[in-house]
Every structure is written in C-alpha cells, then in structure tokens.
Design a protein with these regions (language model features):
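A short, conserved alpha-helix in the catalytic core of glycosyltransferases
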Residues: 185-188, 192-212, 217-244
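Conserved donor NDP-sugar-binding/catalytic core segment of glycosyltransferases
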Residues: 112-148
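Short, flexible, basic/aromatic active-site loop/helix in glycosyltransferases
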Residues: 153-193
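Short, well-formed alpha-helical segments that are part of the catalytic scaffolds
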Residues: 21-38
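Short aromatic/hydrophobic "clamp" motif used to bind/position activated sugar donors
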Residues: 104
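A conserved acidic beta->alpha catalytic loop
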Residues: 49-62
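Glycine-rich, basic loop-to-helix element that forms the pyrophosphate-binding segment
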Residues: 81-99
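Active-site-adjacent helix/loop segment of glycosyltransferases
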Residues: 225-280
Length: 280
C-alpha cells in the first residue's frame, strides 16, 4: 500500500476513523494531538479523519471541528466522508493511500494523548530500526490502568471477558491476567508484546506497506490483532511506559448485539487465519 504523493515525505502522518463517534471527544483528541506535537518541533503533520458514519449532518459538524484545529500545532487536517462504510481497517487504508510518511499513527477518536507521547514514541522508534510497531500504555477516564496490549487469545478467555459474571471471572484471574499481559515492563520501561490495540498504534510505514495495511475482510474487531501478527513478521512489537494515552472506549459486549456479532465474526476470522486456541 503505497502513496502516489510526490511531496517530500513527512516524519509523521496520522489517521483517525470515526463511526458516529462522540464529536466532543474527537475535539479533545485533536487538542491533545496539538499539545503532543509541540515538543516534536515538526512543522507539518498531515492528519486524515475518515468518516464512516454516512450522515451529512454529522460530517458537517466533524468538518467544522477539523477547520478549527487546522494549522494549530502543525496539524494539516483533512476530513474524508466515505460513501460506503467498509469498516475500521478499510477506513485507515483509505487514509494510508493518501499519505506517505516515515512513521504513521493510527488512532481511534476516543483517545487522548499525553503531552510527551508523540515525542517519546518518535525517539524510541528512531533509536531502534527493528521496531515495526509501538504501543502506548493506557488509562481509562478515571485514571485506572487499561491493559491495551494483549497476549494471543483463547476462545475461553474471550468468552470470559465478554459474557462471564464477575464472580466467575475471579475464578479465572490468572488466565485473564496472562491475556492482558499484566506483567511489568523491563528496566528500560519497554517490553515486547504480542498484540496491540488499534485505538493507538505507531507503525513504521515501510513495514506497514510490506504487509499491505489492514485486512479489509475484518469489519470492526480483530483487524488490529491481525495487523499485529503481520507486523511481527517485519520487526519487533513494543510497548513503552513513557508513551501514555487515555482511552475512553472499548468493551464490545456492552455495545449491543450488532457489536457482539461483529466481534464474533472478527474472532472467527482471526482464529481461522492464525490458529485456534480453545483454552489458556
């Protein structure tokens, strides 16, 4: 997946995919991006916001927010409204086809970046060319840790997380903790991970092009896990304690039956491609 852009390649480009997302939260994301770009001294950072909502009124409001932030902190923002919603990964692929940079930041609209997140991420990736993907550590809206990086899942663990009552989850704490990779980082505050959350991924663009971007056969869930598995064939996947975000989303099981259906379809596709694990 390469871009036809003939302009000089920027250091960083960013894509955000929205689907009826909270626009107040989207506004806060752009504010955090502007703040996080200040320490980098990057003059221009292209940002493409891809709207899968298929709603003209929503698009008008989203464009107005982009207009307000365009040029602030180097943000060169474009809003793209899709005629068809082909899914989260497909939305990012549209942005990737229009952008070309050394590093690419893939984002959900429901995150906020720490002021040092971008500068720390670029510093780490500059220092180690073997890194294909860098993931942040996450916190929820109340400041509690969110374990965004994951180990390879089993069907049992996914079912526990989605449907089990709390008392039954407590009986399976070790399995759940292992899946959520709740061990500490090493002395350098980084650790290798297996799977990264698509809510926030720094990727080396050359590695991303090698694997062809997102697999668009996933609609909403597990496309990030599939991409992680592919990128692991190109280099290392790391999580850095110095790169921090707040994540306001997640929990597909609480979003209704449609999301549960998308989640199950994505899980089946992922296991068929990368191998079934029933327990563990």
């Amino acid at each position: 997946m390469t871009s036809g852009n003939l302009n000089p390649k920027p250091e960083l480009a960013i894509s955000v995919v929205l689907f009826h997302s909270d626009l107040d939260q989207f506004d806060r994301l752009l504010a955090s991006l502007s703040d996080a770009l200040l320490p980098t001294q990057l003059a221009v950072v292209p940002v493409i916001c891809v709207d899968n909502s298929l709603n003209p009124d929503y698009a008008l409001r989203g464009r107005a927010i982009c207009d307000r932030w365009r040029g602030v902190g180097g943000l060169a923002i474009d809003w793209v409204s899709n005629a068809v919603n082909a899914g989260y990964g497909a939305g990012h692929n549209i942005a990737l086809s229009r952008l070309n940079s050394r590093y690419h930041l893939l984002l959900n609209p429901d995150v906020e970046l720490d002021k040092s997140a971008i500068s720390e991420a670029l510093r780490l990736m500059d220092s180690d060319p073997r890194v294909a993907l860098l993931a942040p550590v996450g916190f929820d809206s109340h400041g509690e840790p969110e374990y965004l990086a994951k180990d390879y899942p089993s069907v049992w663990v996914l079912a526990l997380r989605a449907f089990a009552p709390r008392w039954f989850k407590r009986l399976n704490t070790k399995r759940l903790d292992r899946y959520e990779m709740r061990r500490r980082a090493d002395a350098n505050n980084v650790r290798g991970i297996v799977l990264a959350s698509g809510c926030c991924m720094w990727v080396r663009r050359g590695a991303l092009d090698q694997v062809g971007g997102f697999d668009e056969s996933y609609f909403l869930y597990f496309e990030d896990y599939d991409l992680s598995m592919k990128l692991a064939q190109q280099g290392n996947l790391l999580e850095s304690q110095a790169v921090r975000i707040v994540h306001h989303g997640g929990d597909a099981a609480r979003k209704g039956w449609q999301h549960i259906g998308w989640f199950m379809a994505g899980a089946i596709r992922f296991f068929r491609r990368w191998g079934w694990r029933w327990f563990g």
